[in-house]
Regions:
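Predominantly a Rossmann-like dinucleotide-binding segment in NAD(P)-dependent oxidoreductases
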Residues: 4-84, 88-91
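Glycine-/small-residue-rich active-site loops that bind phosphorylated ligands and cofactors
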Residues: 5, 117, 192
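A general structural signal for well-ordered alpha-helical segments in protein cores
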Residues: 9-10, 67-68, 166-171, 194-198
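A short glycine-threonine-serine/GTX helix/turn-capping micro-motif
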Residues: 55-61, 155-164
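Contiguous beta-strand/loop segments that form the cofactor/metal-binding neighborhood of enzyme cores
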Residues: 62, 68-143, 170-181
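C-terminal helix-rich "cap/oligomerization" subdomain common to oxidoreductases
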Residues: 105, 172-204
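Active-site loop of classical SDR/Rossmann-like NAD(P)-dependent oxidoreductases
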Residues: 138, 157-171, 185
Length: 204
């Protein structure tokens, strides 16, 4: 599921951060909001993603891992996390609205908000990185243009996905098996994501 790490879009985000285009990173914010789907309104045929006995939780369990994995890939492991959860819409049993705050091992603070029962006007898919010399904004699922703002003005970057989005990760694994490179996307690197999510949900 963490193939996004290797996509050109997110590689460009990392390159912009590492190049110092926004200076020293001061804060990370995840914001995600979508309206409920038509199936969410059905009591009889609810999506498996909101059946806790199958998915373990709601849409947060399905979507947030991608976001959390990316920011940990960029800034290191999160060592503290806490969250507040609620079911505001009442369409299904698991939580549908969450707020969280967390801290990376280097002291960098961050926060996140997720709402899966928002009005269409509130729809959002963004991660904003604030630095002392600028800011960077990008999406995780919609691949909106990457926006860089600093003293040089505003720039937008468009990075097209390969036809098969898992291909860059697969290539990295093949290169690893052939001894040509090291693929860091393994179960060990993925485990901290589950820990962060459990902390946000108050399960640990």
């Amino acid at each position: 599921a963490y193939y996004r790490r290797y996509l050109p879009y997110f590689q460009r985000v990392k390159q912009l951060i590492n190049s110092g285009s926004i200076g020293r990173v001061m804060n990370v914010q995840i914001r995600f909001a979508v309206p409920p789907s038509d199936l969410d309104h059905s009591r009889k045929d609810q999506p498996w993603r909101v059946q806790a006995n199958i998915a373990g939780g709601g849409y947060f369990y399905d979507l947030a891992p991608h976001q959390i994995d990316l920011i940990q890939e960029m800034f290191g492991p999160i060592i503290e996390a806490t969250g507040y959860t609620s079911n505001r819409g009442g369409y299904y049993q698991p939580e549908d609205t969450l707020s969280a705050c967390f801290q990376f091992n280097g002291g960098l603070p961050g926060s996140g908000s997720w709402c899966f029962v928002a009005h269409e006007s509130a729809r959002e898919d963004s991660i904003e990185i604030t630095g002392d010399k600028g800011k960077l904004k990008f999406s995780v699922f919609t691949y909106e243009p990457i926006i860089l703002q600093n003293s040089q003005g505003r720039q937008e970057f468009n990075e097209a996905n390969p036809r098969h989005v898992q291909l860059p990760l697969i290539q990295s694994i093949v290169d690893h098996l052939r001894g040509e490179n090291v693929c860091n996307c393994d179960s060990i690197s993925a485990t901290p994501v589950n820990w962060v999510m459990d902390r946000i949900l108050g399960k640990t």
